[in-house]
Amino acid sequence: MNKFTRASLLIVLLVSACCAQAANLRVEPAKQTSARVQTVQFASKLVGKTLPYNVVLPVNYDKPELRNTRYPVLYLLHGLFGHYDNWTTHTKLAEYASQYEMIIVTPEGNDGWYTDSGTAPRDKYESYLVQELIPDVEKRFRVNNNRASRAIGGLSMGGYGAVKFGVKYPDMFALVASLSGALDAATWSESDLRGFESIWRTLPPVFGAGNSSVRIANDLQKLLRELPPDRIAALPFIYLDCGTEDPLFQSNRDFVELLRSRKIAHEYRELPGNHSWTYWDAQVQDVLRLAAKRFAEPSPAVKAVAP
């Protein structure tokens, strides 16, 4: 047998041995280590068009032995000029969420300020979230549909929206979180936004001109100043933070002073950073930790009050 034949035989034997070993190996499926992101296309009757939303499901959500398990839910709202998928594409939300047993929903709000428009009858982004989105989530997914298991948060425009939902619908949420919130947006005038014309152009279509009824009804500071004591006691816990280099830094400080003066339960943090995804990627981790803690230690039931 020449050297080439011996070499060929050796290769055949080695390959055969490897194949035999492989045939006896049990290949385990890769374990899922990050939460799963699923997109839902929802046909809104109130807004008159399809509004997608993302759902971040817990790592073990699909395990057969957990098919009867229900989860708390955190709604995260995007900012102005953003969309429903910002949280899952601009932050490591799915990775961070893998540590927690909660469902996270990121709705589409377009540039509607999470408000029922005073000028466009079909732009009902506040009613959509309360009357359509939340019921749809609770129908499609295994979420607990009680106040103690529901939280809402957001960044910038979404921070404004989250706080507003907490103030207007305190019986629905146990926790509100605002990151760099545009908390006084309903009071902004054109002169306030000189140099930020693109932002200004989104406001009149939603809130109307001047002191319109829609502006007044969605002015967070006015809403909080006029709340009677029994409604203050019914508010969810409010978490706020803002970067010290953020253009909205002072307005967040002013808002917190109002919370303090009215003795509204809250936590406020000032941190290095600006109005950027780098800041929000870091701070959403704190929101998840706070939500998980709140869900584990639910607040007492709060009597429903009309918004």
Please place each PLM-identified region on the residue numbering.
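Bacterial N-terminal signal peptides
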Residues: 8-17
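Bacterial N-terminal signal peptides that target proteins for export
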Residues: 1-9
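Non-catalytic cap/lid and distal C-terminal segments of serine-dependent acyl enzymes
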Residues: 21-307
